[in-house]
Structures are given as structure tokens and as C-alpha cells.
Amino acid sequence: MLITNMTHHIAKITELVGSSDKGWQEAAKVALDEATKTIRGITGLEVISKTATVDPNTGNITQYKTTIKVAFGLER
């Protein structure tokens, strides 16, 4: 569940995509770290999808991408 311990009556959901050459978990962390720079009060996240870019010559993954949704309460 995306919204946990919600103290606000209204939550905003924002979708972000992070990327990494290390893995999907690192890509999610990149997205969350960037979100915390401009969004206050993030209460949870949900992983929506995981994708990757593959080098056609080697068959190796060159970039991992994780799409997440973050929830936060609206301030008045």
C-alpha cells in the first residue's frame, strides 16, 4: 500500500523514474533521493515498473530504470 501513517486528509501522488547502471534498487533510490530535494513529508513509495536498456552487441544490461510513485501530504 502506498499511503501509510497518513496524518493529512489529502495525499498527493507523484510518479518518478530513476536510472542507474548498478541495479533497479539503486535506480529507485536515485528517484527517491531526488524527490526528497523538493518534496517534503514523503510517507511512502510504490514501485510501478522496472525496465532496462540492453547493449545489442553484448547482451548486457547497460542501464536499469525504476518507476516509482511517492505519496506525501498536502500542506496548507
Where would I find each of the regions flagged by the language model?
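Alpha-helical assembly-interface signal, strongest on the long, hydrophobic N-terminal helix that forms
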Residues: 2-8
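Short, well-ordered alpha-helical segments
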Residues: 8-44
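Solvent-exposed beta-strand sheet faces enriched in polar/charged residues
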Residues: 46-48
